[in-house]
């Protein structure tokens, strides 16, 4: 049998890439964990956080947010990922705190913070976020959609799901000349950004430059980017990439936020 022609090969590669991306974006398997809550009735205490999003209301995440235990947080690489939770997992614990199935349907939350370990306490008596435990410290409004306030802690099952966002990805440029710190937020699809590259200007000499993750979802470049239009390539944990060309005009200023393309 003759080998396929180049156009056919390109089509096959494209189909393979699409299937791989669809598989990566599909919901993962259910895993047992536990959940608590923090931040107050209006979730104001969840603002800020180890992902660097600051005001999660303004970043589009609302109150459906969670702080992850250290083993799940991955030093910030899980920031922006989405998880579906349902109360009453198989990992043990008191399920009486769960709302009835008809009332307590599953919820989808975004990882926006770290639940720090407390090695002074055992994992089943306050050290909920100690390694190797899988734990969600939910915003209070999110917790109350699946469990009763008085329960405090409940067993849950969770799985990774694709993030659904309104509008495009957001790029907030902070820092100063030669220290550009770009916060990437409102990321759809896998949600967890694992790599960012920036290109300044549009001339022939313009080259993509890899950025280094500084903390959370703040990405750093030591190049002089002032006075040039900026393009960004964002790659998520499932190895999918989206390019936003000239998302920031040449006259951009530090402190501004720009909206680019989105994962679909």
UniProtKB/Swiss-Prot annotation:
Could you tell me which residue ranges the Expansin-like CBD domain spans?
Answer: 178-260
Instruction: Report what the protein is called.
Output: Expansin-A21
Q: Start and end of every Expansin-like EG45 domain? A: 48-168
Alphabetized, the UniProt keywords read: Cell wall, Cell wall biogenesis/degradation, Membrane, Secreted, Signal
Topology relative to the membrane, per the entry? Peripheral membrane protein
Q: Which InterPro entries match?
A: Expan_Lol_pI (IPR007118), Expansin (IPR002963), Expansin/allergen_DPBB_dom (IPR007112), Expansin_CBD (IPR007117), Expansin_CBD_sf (IPR036749), RlpA-like_DPBB (IPR009009), RlpA-like_sf (IPR036908)
PANTHER family, per the entry: EXPANSIN-A15 (PTHR31867)
Query: Its GO CC terms?
Result: extracellular region; membrane
Upper classification of the source organism reads: Eukaryota, Viridiplantae, Streptophyta, Embryophyta, Tracheophyta
> Could you say which protein family the record assigns here?
Belongs to the expansin family. Expansin A subfamily.
What is one Pfam family matched by this protein? DPBB_1
- Signal peptide span per the entry? 1-24
Protein localization = Secreted, Cell wall; Membrane
Q: What does this protein do?
A: May cause loosening and extension of plant cell walls by disrupting non-covalent bonding between cellulose microfibrils and matrix glucans. No enzymatic activity has been found. May be required for rapid internodal elongation in deepwater rice during submergence.
BP-aspect Gene Ontology terms: plant-type cell wall loosening
């Amino acid at each position: 049998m003759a080998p396929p022609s180049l156009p056919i090969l390109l089509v096959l590669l494209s189909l393979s890439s699409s299937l791989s991306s669809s598989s990566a974006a599909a919901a993962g398997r259910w895993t047992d964990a536990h959940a608590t809550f923090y931040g107050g009735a209006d979730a104001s205490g969840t603002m800020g956080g180890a992902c660097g999003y600051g005001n999660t209301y303004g970043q589009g995440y609302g109150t459906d947010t969670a702080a992850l235990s250290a083993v799940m947080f991955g030093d910030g690489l899980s920031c922006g990922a989405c998880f579906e939770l349902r109360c009453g997992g198989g990992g043990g614990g008191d399920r009486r705190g769960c709302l009835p199935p008809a009332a307590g349907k599953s919820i989808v939350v975004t990882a926006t913070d770290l639940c720090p370990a407390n090695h002074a306490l055992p994992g089943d008596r306050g050290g909920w976020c100690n390694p190797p435990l899988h734990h969600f410290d939910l915003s209070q409004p999110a917790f109350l959609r699946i469990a009763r306030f008085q329960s405090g802690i409940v067993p849950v099952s969770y799985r990774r799901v694709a993030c659904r966002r309104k509008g495009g990805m957001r790029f907030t440029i902070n820092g100063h000349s030669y220290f550009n710190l770009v916060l990437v937020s409102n990321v759809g699809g896998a949600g967890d950004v694992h790599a960012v590259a920036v290109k300044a200007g549009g001339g022939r000499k313009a080259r993509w430059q890899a950025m280094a993750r500084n903390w959370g979802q703040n990405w750093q470049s030591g190049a002089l980017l002032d006075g040039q239009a900026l393009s960004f390539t964002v790659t998520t944990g499932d190895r999918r990439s989206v390019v936003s060309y000239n998302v920031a005009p040449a006259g951009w200023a530090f402190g501004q936020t720009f909206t680019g393309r989105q994962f679909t």
